[in-house]
Amino acid sequence: MHATDFGLTLIIANPAAQSGAAREVAGRLQRFMDMTARASQFDLVLTERMGHAKELAAQAQGYRTVIALGGDGVIHEVVNGLMTQDEAVRPALAILPVGSGNDFAQTLGIDDFSGKDFGALLSCELQRQDIGRIRSWNPASGSGEASVEYYDQTLSIGIDAAIGLGTTELRKKTGLAGTPLYTLSGLEQFGLRYRNYPMTVSFDGAPAERVQAIIMAIQLGPTYGSGYRICPEADPCDGMLDVCYACGPVPRAVALPMFLSAKDGHHTKLPPVRMRPCRHAELTFEEPDYPIQADGEPIVASRIEVDVLGGALHVWRPTH
């Protein structure tokens, strides 16, 4: 088995992840790296505030690898920081997921990390991973300029975004994680936020179409919501975005089973659901305050443009 050498490595860990358990995991990771010499040299930094992981990754010049230890939020920040670096010197990304969703980790084949077993780091290979770029316009900002955000797994608008964003407070109340958390959030948000979200959409420069979207997911990987296979055929290395959207009006009594059927990818042939690949998407929202999320992080916008950046990031994944 070929042993992985990450080279000069920066470990960015969110100590608050998994209700604070990630601090202990970071300590165990440090001892593992010392014992196994998987990196020629490594530095460990604990994040101190929101946005800190992005800053650290953006400043990680000279490193061959950046390891993100935490939930989807810290991984999303690290990806956004790395994407500010020039591609020629951009470090590779490795992840150790200690969060509630972990869809990007599942896409990479890391689906059983417990915080104690670092075997996923023993034998890894590099792959070039597509990254999504979102340009968003928020009239409330007053600048008229687009904000830029990158994502590694999922972008969604509508009830599915409301479900993802709703997990933050629900996790604090219930202590749930993974699929049970997202399923409970789905049941709650279907009562609070279920409606049509009218928008105008255009894919790859085609004429714009007005749709009454219930959900709109623009994926790099196949899953969101801790394993819901919303775009079962999505491949994060094919240079394409995979889109799933469902158009209303659809009664709640029909929409809820449709949503639950996405757990196993059985929704794709249902009448309200449309599936398509694209490289570029433009969406204009007819009303303010639509729920929008990218890798679980909120976006406020009246219009967005989405592009795929093919093979933009080197990512370490376990060798299977």
Where are these regions (language model features)?
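ATP/nucleoside-binding phosphotransfer catalytic cores, i.e., glycine-rich phosphate-binding loops
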Residues: 203-210, 229-320
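Short amphipathic alpha-helical segments
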Residues: 23-25, 79-82, 106-108, 229-230
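Short Gly/Thr/Asp-enriched flexible loops that form oxyanion-binding sites at enzyme active sites
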Residues: 74-87
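Short glycine-rich anion-binding loops that position phosphate/pyrophosphate groups of nucleotides
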Residues: 16-17, 71-74, 98-101, 157, ...
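ATP/NTP phosphate-donor binding region
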Residues: 1-69, 76, 116
